[in-house]
Curated annotation (Swiss-Prot):
Residue positions bearing lipid (S-palmitoyl cysteine): 322-323
Effect upon mutating residue 347 to L: In RP4; common variant
Tissue: Rod shaped photoreceptor cells which mediate vision in dim light.
Organism for this UniProt entry: Homo sapiens
Positions carrying Phosphoserine: 334, 338, 343
UniProt-annotated stretches for the region Interaction with SAG: 330-348
Annotated positions binding Zn(2+): 201, 279
Short sequence motif 'Ionic lock' involved in activated form stabilization: positions: 134-136
N-acetylmethionine modified-residue sites: 1
N6-(retinylidene)lysine, modified sites: 296
Subcellular location: Membrane; Cell projection, Cilium, Photoreceptor outer segment
UniProt-recorded name of the protein: Rhodopsin
Gene3D superfamilies reported in the protein's UniProt record: Rhodopsin 7-helix transmembrane proteins (1.20.1070.10)
Residues bearing carbohydrate: 2, 15
Length: 348
């Protein structure tokens, strides 16, 4: 074996020389240089400094401006809540542990950190699934009389939490487990061992099928149909120019969110899948650390995309920050905001 397995950890380093120690008790400087741990800490600090204000501001601005409380925005706000879970429940602890060179909070802290990181990532993924379905129903109109309303949005939010908990909670109940990963300063689901005592193999298969592959299939199907429908409608001029423009802008925003999600999470999922299907193979701690920490940047891109591509939200945010006056001169009362007929989201 090219790694060292303990009762509640797996260190990707052979203990042939006897240097491996528990990542809950000793610094892991035999895995990497101390400066590399410091770089990880600096990166986590950057994500906290950027991630908390922008996600909190997204929630605060929506509470302050009633016009932003539209059904589709409920799902987008759900993304902000998920990102805050990741920032507060995961990033802060990882910053602290990186500074110490090992996971100082012990197995219980590892469970909590892994739970919040998994929960936030899964809420984001299933929120994108709900957004894809909403775009498909609104634009492709498989149900001609359907209107995406507040009740549908609330059910969509509830669905994302149920599915996220169905992925994040089982390791706390004994189906699989959370262990330190990479440089042993952050925790995630155990992809490294089969661990029959906790039926780890069945859980990892379940997670990859139900909580990654199926959502991706739904998302790609919905947007494949959507692109075809938008092109067909444009060719036949079935909708008014204003409605077409608004629907295209909202669709473009959501598609960019999906692409950003894939850029952040597919490398992590791919490496995790490789590790799981190549048990005992030779790989270093950096092999998993880089995609794991890169995936954490997902906490800042959704609100950035939303702010950049949604003029109505951008104006409301500037008005809130600048104490009631928009410095760009777009007065809220007089600004013309095009809303789609069904989803009521302003185009950029």
């Amino acid at each position: 074996m090219n790694g060292t397995e303990g009762p509640n950890f797996y260190v990707p380093f052979s203990n042939a020389t006897g240097v491996v120690r528990s990542p809950f008790e000793y610094p892991q400087y035999y895995l990497a240089e101390p400066w590399q741990f410091s770089m990880l800490a600096a990166y986590m600090f950057l994500l906290i400094v950027l991630g908390f204000p922008i996600n909190f501001l997204t929630l605060y601005v929506t509470v302050q401006h009633k016009k932003l409380r539209t059904p589709l925005n409920y799902i987008l706000l759900n993304l902000a809540v998920a990102d805050l879970f990741m920032v507060l429940g995961g990033f802060t602890s990882t910053l602290y542990t990186s500074l110490h060179g090992y996971f100082v909070f012990g197995p219980t802290g590892c469970n909590l950190e892994g739970f919040f990181a998994t929960l936030g990532g899964e809420i984001a993924l299933w929120s994108l699934v709900v957004l894809a379905i909403e775009r498909y129903v609104v634009v492709c109109k498989p149900m001609s009389n359907f209107r995406f309303g507040e009740n549908h949005a609330i059910m969509g939010v509830a669905f994302t939490w149920v599915m996220a908990l169905a992925c994040a909670a089982p390791p706390l109940a004994g189906w699989s487990r959370y262990i330190p990963e990479g440089l042993q300063c952050s925790c995630g689901i155990d992809y490294y061992t089969l661990k029959p005592e906790v039926n780890n193999e069945s859980f990892v298969i379940y997670m990859f099928v139900v909580h990654f592959t199926i959502p991706m299939i739904i998302i790609f199907f919905c947007y494949g149909q959507l692109v075809f429908t938008v092109k067909e409608a444009a060719a036949q001029q079935q909708e008014s120019a204003t409605t077409q423009k608004a629907e295209k802008e909202v669709t473009r925003m959501v598609i960019i969110m999906v692409i950003a999600f894939l850029i952040c999470w597919v490398p992590y999922a791919s490496v995790a899948f490789y590790i799981f299907t190549h048990q005992g193979s030779n790989f270093g701690p950096i092999f998993m650390t880089i995609p794991a920490f890169f995936a954490k940047s997902a906490a800042i891109y959704n609100p950035v995309i939303y702010i950049m591509m949604n003029k109505q939200f951008r104006n409301c945010m500037l008005t809130t920050i600048c104490c009631g006056k928009n410095p760009l001169g777009d007065d809220e009362a007089s600004a013309t905001v095009s809303k789609t007929e069904t989803s009521q989201v302003a185009p950029a």
